[in-house]
Amino acid sequence: TTIAETERWERLADELRNFHDVARFLRPSPGDVPRIDGLDLACLTLPLHDVVGGDHLAWVDFDRRYDLDARIAEAEKQERTEVSRNLRRLRKRAGVLVADASGHRVTDALVAAMLHQAFLLGVNYELDLFGEVTTHLFDNLNTRFYKTTAVNKFFTMIYGEISEGGKLRFLSAGHPPPAVFAREFGRFMKISE
């Protein structure tokens, strides 16, 4: 090999290490798991190849991530009572997005990273408009990703919100239904739509 080829491979390896760092940053840390009274929330992702791949998880602790107090005050100032009421409900809810981009390559991790940022930004706007996450967000994500990714790139996702009483509401976009541990029955149970 020539010196130029060696330098090119070193730059490529450096870029891959850099991408690994970015992908690692997007993975939730234990401190990111929201706290909901009366519930134990946990999740685990095991990427096929190190940290890079198409599997993705994003927790949504509405209060910590989106400053509900400021949003509620703004909604009340604008006399948007329904938005204010919806925002107050989020204090007792947590959200989780699980997505799976097709494949286990660096490009699939890139699609997952794009989805991560688009999702969190979309939630930000949804809270301003409606005071909660609605199906509009997922319609928009689907449309945008369909128009901007290659034909052979796709993802499935499921978004759920769990409240203090243990009630789970979820939306699935081609993703298998969730499984939850039911203390009453002492086992994991699949939830049907």
Describe each PLM feature range.
Residues 5-193:
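… and, occasionally, acidic/histidine-rich disordered N-termini of signaling adaptors
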